[in-house]
Amino acid sequence: MAGKAAAPGTAVLLVTANVGSLFDDPENLQKNWLREFYQVVHTHKPHFMALHCQEFGGKNYEASMSHVDKFVKELLSSDAMKEYNRARVYLDENYKSQEHFTALGSFYFLHESLKNIYQFDFKAKKYRKVAGKEIYSDTLESTPMLEKEKFPQDYFPECKWSRKGFIRTRWCIADCAFDLVNIHLFHDASNLVAWETSPSVYSGIRHKALGYVLDRIIDQRFEKVSYFVFGDFNFRLDSKSVVETLCTKATMQTVRAADTNEVVKLIFRESDNDRKVMLQLEKKLFDYFNQEVFRDNNGTALLEFDKELSVFKDRLYELDISFPPSYPYSEDARQGEQYMNTRCPAWCDRILMSPSAKELVLRSESEEKVVTYDHIGPNVCMGDHKPVFLAFRIMPGAGKPHAHVHKCCVVQ
């Protein structure tokens, strides 16, 4: 039986993981990753589990196809998952289509003890009972059980295509209907550009794209239900403020390219102490002399610079973060806690929810202290992103009967 014997309700586990690194070094990283993932499953024993992956297949999808198949097969048939007798897997494998390819992968697992679970058919506009294990890939656009979109081209910085978009599914469990949205937003292309303004130009691009997703999932086409949006939001700390704080007493040296006069490097040195270098900043270099600042007390002193979610405070809620920045970790299999010096560490990977979904989660917290929001594999190399998870329970009677949904209820 899933769930702790005494705890009522339906145990839910939501996980987001940017897995791009796993397919570059499958021998070492995949084993680590799966072991840590299974440990979280074992600890929380969910009845319903959703795993949202970004950059599925790595940087070169075509070259990674065999590793992808092996990873999916392992997840579906492993001993750790044997009690999950129903599954839905949606893999965007359409890598030849620039206009459509998002490299998103969404996995949903249902425990054998879970009864009365339905998935929404977006074309027929009705719920269907979930049975068996099914994998969908290649052309997800024609699959009625989900909505998939890549962002419009004019949303992309300089209109250059990259693998960014979202996949939405809708479920009804224990008389509660909710959307689960797998999302991947735009990254910071240059540390130097991010440093120029506060907020950065990149945060504005992410703001626009996330607003687009939220507008899509609450538009008039379908009934409104609670929603959880989890993925790689690429949220970054406000770079200008962070640098000012980390280098308060530093002097700045600017290095320019000889031919173009373009700024290519910033060097921040202590005013005294032999003018020791504190921080070096380049397009893809963020080399701060003391990484401990990002790990001390899980880096929570830096949360004041994590501001990108504030513009959505009426539409998206998040539990308090008590884990260190989830990116960019070293991809060296021997380094589990070291950050790469490519970017300022940030909480890119998040699990966010609508106000009504928040009520659903917090209701279980008040009755049974069973809500956990944390990262996976704190001491183990999991690739450049640490996965992040939310575990909670849907309490009996949490859903309210709703006339329009057959055998399903909506949290108001």
From Swiss-Prot:
Matches recorded under InterPro entries: Endo/exonu/phosph_ase_sf, INPP5A, IPPc
PTM statement from Swiss-Prot or TrEMBL: Isoprenylation at Cys-409 is required for localization at the membrane.
Tissues and organs where the protein is expressed, per its UniProt entry: Predominantly expressed in heart, brain, and skeletal muscle. In brain; high level in Purkinje cells.
EC number: 3.1.3.56
Residue ranges annotated as propeptide in the record: 410-412
UniProtKB keywords: Cell membrane, Cell projection, Hydrolase, Lipoprotein, Membrane, Prenylation
Covalently lipidated residues, kind S-farnesyl cysteine: C409
Family annotation (Pfam families): Exo_endo_phos2 (PF22669)
Record membrane topology: Lipid-anchor
One cellular component term from this protein's GO annotations in UniProt: dendrite
Stretch forming the signal peptide: none
Catalytic activity: 1D-myo-inositol 1,4,5-trisphosphate + H2O = 1D-myo-inositol 1,4-bisphosphate + phosphate; 1D-myo-inositol 1,3,4,5-tetrakisphosphate + H2O = 1D-myo-inositol 1,3,4-trisphosphate + phosphate
Any one GO biological process: negative regulation of phospholipase C-activating G protein-coupled receptor signaling pathway
GO function terms (MF aspect): inositol-1,3,4,5-tetrakisphosphate 5-phosphatase activity; inositol-1,4,5-trisphosphate 5-phosphatase activity; inositol-polyphosphate 5-phosphatase activity; PH domain binding
Localization in the cell: Cell membrane; Cell projection, Dendrite
Subunit-level organization: Interacts with TASOR.
Record function comment: Phosphatase that specifically hydrolyzes the 5-phosphate of inositol 1,4,5-trisphosphate to inositol 1,4-bisphosphate, and inositol 1,3,4,5-tetrasphosphate to inositol 1,3,4-trisphosphate. Plays a crucial role in the survival of cerebellar Purkinje cells.
Family statement drawn from the similarity comment of this UniProt entry: Belongs to the inositol 1,4,5-trisphosphate 5-phosphatase type I family.
Protein's name according to its UniProt entry: Inositol polyphosphate-5-phosphatase A
Species per Swiss-Prot/TrEMBL record: Homo sapiens (Human)
Top-level taxonomy: Eukaryota, Metazoa, Chordata, Craniata, Vertebrata
